[in-house]
């Protein structure tokens, strides 16, 4: 009778040819190690990218929270300006408007306290201070013999910063050097 071959249907690898040689196994191990190293490197890169995306998202949310008040605060500034202007134009000696003036002062103080609480800081340059193009907006230039050129002569309107970012520049008049006096016709003769 012919020899019967038994075929193991449960383990197909058992039916394969005899084991590969040592060189083939070493090559196979090296290839697998390289694939493993590449997969680990790819995994580290994906983890780093994920961490960068997470950090960027956190920064974006932080900025959104920090500057969410920007438009609202900008809309409130004209109200603060009007209250300040009302105080400047009213006489502190006039008894008939004293209660109104006190009310404006209290309201303005509440506004200033609230603005400070939300990191809104006034940019109010003083006369003689050097002009700073980042924080100031020159509305006019005027000759002045008393001040250095590019110094602030007058402040029309205070500026404001929100969390260190300029919300509105201070509007100012800037000094310039006086024009040289040319001799008159009589002096030339």
Swiss-Prot record:
Renumbered residue ranges of the record's region Disordered: 1-24
Keywords on record: Chaperone, Cytoplasm, Stress response
SUPFAM superfamilies in UniProt: Coiled-coil domain of nucleotide exchange factor GrpE, Head domain of nucleotide exchange factor GrpE
Record GO cellular component, one term: cytosol
Gene3D superfamilies per the UniProt record, alphabetical: 3.90.20.20, Head domain of nucleotide exchange factor GrpE
GO molecular function, one term: unfolded protein binding
Secretion signal span: none
Highest taxon listed in the record's lineage: Bacteria
Entry annotated with the keyword Chaperone: yes
Subcellular location: Cytoplasm
Predominant place of localization: cytoplasm
GO BP, sorted A to Z: protein folding
Transmembrane segments: none
Function: Participates actively in the response to hyperosmotic and heat shock by preventing the aggregation of stress-denatured proteins, in association with DnaK and GrpE. It is the nucleotide exchange factor for DnaK and may function as a thermosensor. Unfolded proteins bind initially to DnaJ; upon interaction with the DnaJ-bound protein, DnaK hydrolyzes its bound ATP, resulting in the formation of a stable complex. GrpE releases ADP from DnaK; ATP binding to DnaK triggers the release of the substrate protein, thus completing the reaction cycle.
Self-association state and partner proteins as the record states: Homodimer.
Protein family membership: Belongs to the GrpE family.
Protein known as: Protein GrpE
Organism of provenance: Pseudomonas fluorescens (strain Pf0-1)
């Amino acid at each position: 009778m012919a020899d019967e071959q038994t075929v193991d249907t449960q383990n197909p690898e058992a039916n394969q040819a005899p084991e590969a040689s040592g060189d083939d196994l070493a090559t196979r191990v090296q290839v697998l190690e390289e694939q493993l190293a590449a997969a680990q490197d790819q995994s580290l890169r994906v983890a780093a990218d994920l961490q960068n995306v997470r950090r960027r998202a956190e920064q974006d949310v932080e900025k959104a929270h920090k500057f969410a008040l920007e438009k609202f605060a900008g809309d409130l500034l004209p109200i603060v300006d009007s209250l300040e202007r009302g105080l400047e134009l009213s006489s502190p000696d006039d008894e008939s408007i004293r209660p109104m003036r006190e009310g404006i002062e209290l309201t303005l103080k509440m506004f200033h306290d609230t603005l400070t609480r939300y990191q809104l800081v006034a940019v109010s340059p003083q006369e003689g201070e050097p002009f700073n193009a980042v924080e100031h907006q020159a509305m006019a230039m005027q000759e002045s013999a008393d001040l250095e050129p590019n110094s602030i002569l007058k402040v029309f309107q205070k500026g404001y910063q929100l969390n260190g970012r300029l919300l509105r520049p201070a509007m100012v008049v800037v000094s310039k050097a006086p024009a040289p006096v040319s001799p008159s016709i009589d002096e030339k003769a």
